């Protein structure tokens, strides 16, 4: 919700309120993540004992997690600060900050884990400290930029200021969080269906899921960069440009995902053999790669439409879309396909579900744009 709210305010040239909302957002993240970190710190023993950790292993878990929970605040705040930067139109700096954090972590890890010269090796505790330091550098960098660019107020807000400005973030953020929580549930249900076809099918499905995260990386990048562009134009009441940005992103993702599908199709044999020597698993990985990625473009349409709805402050529409895609189309289509045509039917069902939902998503957003344009005309 941070990017959508601040983008709209900046688009309407309401910089004063944009600064207040940005500050309220960072304070909210600080409070929520701080609370979760305290709870996590207190419950290290019971949680990991439930997970089967031995007393010897608990010592190492304490060394790592006690520092990780403290450092979690240093991760959450830069992520939120990066959303503010993206909302202002800067998409490069957030990438640089995250990349720098990764580089610092990679440099400090061997130094603090194994030691060097006067620096004594700390083992797994050193790994946690290296991660926390890398996140801390990112936090300092983000805060300096936000203050320097006048995108936040360099003080804590008064209680009344905080409550007034945080409401809009929760209005969009809570439904968006709910939509994100539904995806692993649906994937878990489909994984259970896949399990009926044996261990080889589960292994192939797992490999497919990892390949999907790589194949859809451009889609995920667009889902983060499109909302600020739409929000700013929405705030400036330039609805025609909102639709142009949305439609351009849709055409691009369909084309790029078609190219990615073609590449995966051509190299499916090679990739399958890289992952496994088992012939049965390899054949199912090939089956996955020659069917499921065909629907990634349609999936991208749904994902970008969800982002666009959030950007124009229609979070419930995005939640409804995600619910429909997962539980009215994806899970039922996969289940019916598996009954009628086995594992191939399940894969085809996933593609059909994404395709049908993509068409519905596009038509719904186009209708919403028409409503906004009519409202704009009537006001003028």
Predicted regions and their residues:
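Transmembrane helical elements of multi-pass membrane transporters/channels
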Residues: 67, 78, 101, 134-138, ...
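Residue-level recognition of pore/gate-forming positions within transmembrane alpha-helices
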Residues: 24, 33, 37, 101-103, ...
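Small-residue-rich hydrophobic transmembrane alpha-helices
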Residues: 1-38, 75-94, 191, 204-262, ...
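Alpha-helical transmembrane segments of multi-pass membrane proteins
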Residues: 55-81, 219, 279-302
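Short membrane-interface helical motifs at transmembrane helix boundaries
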Residues: 35-66, 259-282, 286
